[in-house]
UniProtKB/Swiss-Prot annotation:
This is Probable sulfate/thiosulfate import ATP-binding protein CysA. The gene is cysA. NCBIfam families: 3a0106s01. One of its GO terms (molecular function) is ABC-type sulfate transporter activity. ATP binds at G35, P36, S37, G38, S39, G40, K41, S42. InterPro entries: AAA+_ATPase, ABC_SmlMolc_Importer, ABC_transporter-like_ATP-bd, ABC_transporter-like_CS, P-loop_NTPase, Sulph_transpt1. It comes from the Eukaryota. It catalyses: sulfate(out) + ATP + H2O = sulfate(in) + ADP + phosphate + H(+); thiosulfate(out) + ATP + H2O = thiosulfate(in) + ADP + phosphate + H(+). It comes from Chlorella vulgaris (Green alga).
Length: 236
């Protein structure tokens, strides 16, 4: 699904979180929203998801105005930073949660859950509970649950922030391979420039609610637009 963000602004009290943001995201791309704390990256992701309403501007999904559309109508999967798994449900039950709500046929539901557990390399953990899993495994369960409803867009809010450096690096490689397999338009938030540069096909760098530069890791490294980009990416 293609995404067009058109002149989006969002204020929280006196704080300008987003200031006339314009961005086009191509169908099937893997995009990283990068920036320091308070830059607006997570707010932009939440506006995309329908979890926050913009003060002005429009969100277009595949050419359709989705600005006022509810999250459940946007065909979007959202993965929260803290995973938001249900501790009293098994891995399989967590993955199947959205399918249960939609009253999907039990055989189709089981088939879909098994496919996702295999895709996430979690086949052996279907009957386990979240507290029996590592952080990396819990993150993969959260991704499987987000993908269960076959969304056209996958949004991830700092998906690896709570993990140690070794696991983060492993999951970055795994997520890149997963995106190559499923080709779902994917947007993730990070404050870690090395993570964005390793994972994203296109990086959107924000500061103070504005987009400062858009480009590949190579383009940002070779042609930084100003001293903020140079300093933030450690190019000095």
């Amino acid at each position: 699904m293609s995404i067009l963000i058109e002149n989006i602004s969002k204020r929280f009290g006196s704080f300008q979180a987003l200031d006339r943001v314009n961005l086009e995201i191509k169908n099937g791309s893997l995009v990283g929203l990068l920036g320091p704390s308070g830059s607006g990256k997570s707010t932009l992701l939440r506006v995309l998801a329908g979890l926050e309403k913009p003060d002005s501007g429009r969100i277009w999904l595949e050419g359709q105005d989705a600005t006022q559309m509810k999250l459940q109508d946007r065909e979007i999967g959202f993965v929260f930073q803290n995973y938001a798994l249900f501790p009293h449900l098994t891995v399989s039950e967590n993955v199947a949660f959205g399918l249960e709500i939609q009253k999907i046929d039990s055989l189709l539901k089981k088939k879909r859950v098994n496919e996702l557990l295999k895709l996430m390399q979690l086949e052996k953990f279907g009957d386990s509970y979240p507290n029996q899993l590592s952080g990396g495994q819990r993150q993969r369960v959260a991704l499987a649950r987000a993908l269960a409803m076959e969304p056209k867009v996958l949004l991830l809010d700092e998906p690896f922030a709570a993990l140690d450096a070794k696991i983060r690096k492993q999951l970055r490689s795994w997520l890149r391979e997963l995106h190559h397999k499923i080709s779902v338009t994917t947007v993730f938030v990070t404050h870690d420039y090395s993570e964005a540069m390793e994972l994203a096909q296109e990086i959107v760098l924000l500061e103070n609610g504005k987009i400062i530069q858009i480009g590949s890791a190579q383009e940002l490294s070779d042609h930084p637009t100003n001293t903020f980009v140079t300093n933030f990416l450690g190019l000095k």
